[in-house]
């Protein structure tokens, strides 16, 4: 993920929201930007800045995860680390090549017991999340966006199942689905 003044501001704002007893981890792929962020945010005891690829970073556990770079797919580690009622905000984007800004939609996922509620919030154009992009997922996401109806997404399914007409985007580790409610008993 690429850091900017916006990312630094977002981390600082989140740190204020969680307060002095909370903990915020900022992740930056670029060594110099991570060092600068660490320096600029040193006054916030509850902030930790890591220099690593956010696309491959798996937090231990989290109430909230905010990805500020476009991905073609969700990572199992991000979903696995969400505590109950935890939220994940992620721009799902398609791009003409892996290093250009992608266009897509901001996805909100909420972990609710055994299920994940999901819906798109708004269109977005943003820089790429290097470790969470691949061409196959890019094409699958592009095809789903061409079909439209992104507003019909209501849940994220993690159980293995065959693609069906309720799958807006069917992937290897997740499916963005138009199904609502308790989906744990949905037949394949």
Question: What residue ranges belong to the model's regions?
Answer:
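SAM/dcSAM-binding transferase cores
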Residues: 96-188
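Conserved nucleotide-cofactor-binding alpha/beta core module
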Residues: 1-103, 111
């Amino acid at each position: 993920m690429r850091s900017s003044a916006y990312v630094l501001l977002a981390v600082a704002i989140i740190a204020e929201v969680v307060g002095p007893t909370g903990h915020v981890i900022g992740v930056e792929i670029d060594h110099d930007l991570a060092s600068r962020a660490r320096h600029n945010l040193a006054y916030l005891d509850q902030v930790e800045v890591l220099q690593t690829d956010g696309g491959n970073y798996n937090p231990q556990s989290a109430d909230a995860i905010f990805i500020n770079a476009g991905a073609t797919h969700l990572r199992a580690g991000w979903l696995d680390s969400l505590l109950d009622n935890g939220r994940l905000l992620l721009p799902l984007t398609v791009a003409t090549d892996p290093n250009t800004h992608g266009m897509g939609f901001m996805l909100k996922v909420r972990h609710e017991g055994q299920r994940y509620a999901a819906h798109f919030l708004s269109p977005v154009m943003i820089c790429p999340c290097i470790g969470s992009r691949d061409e196959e997922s890019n094409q699958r996401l592009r095809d789903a966006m061409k079909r439209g109806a992104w507003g019909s997404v209501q849940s994220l399914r993690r159980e293995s199942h065959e693609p069906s007409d309720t799958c807006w985007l069917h992937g290897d580790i997740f499916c963005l689905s138009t199904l609502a409610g308790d989906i744990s008993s949905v037949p394949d």
